[in-house]
């Protein structure tokens, strides 16, 4: 093989490496994206449904409304996140939020739940929200997330923090909870994107 041909092969390899960069999601380990919301529609990336939930749908003084926002955590101009407008300012006990089906997903090879979150500075937002995971037996384990800011922030919660779940081979649901004890202010909005299981 002459020098000109060798040089051509080397250049082709270099150009291919530049054109196809390694995925940032895979750079530090393994990741399964559950929901990137980029379609701006249901279902999530693993075929699961999702939406807002209310403790008492008949109580108009409280509730969460879910919508798609064209504010992507990774800066994708065509991407989306979900926006959760919550209200727990009620004379009645109030809690509500967001649910997402995980369809029995096996998370055994992963060790952390990751996602991006930020608050809406214009409307106001709680600096704390409760994050729950449920297994197939509907056993719920919760983690109180704090330090939410008005800028996108990547959250990584080790599975060990969800200490009531002992079997990670079949998970049923991811839940966000706003409540009248921890959500201050009692009405506001947060955005969430790129929900995933990761091995870190």
Predicted regions: what they are:
Residues 1-10:
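Bacterial N-terminal signal peptides that target proteins for export
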Residues 16-24:
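C-terminal segment of classical bacterial N-terminal signal peptides
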Residues 23-200:
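Beta-rich carbohydrate-recognition modules and glycan-binding surfaces
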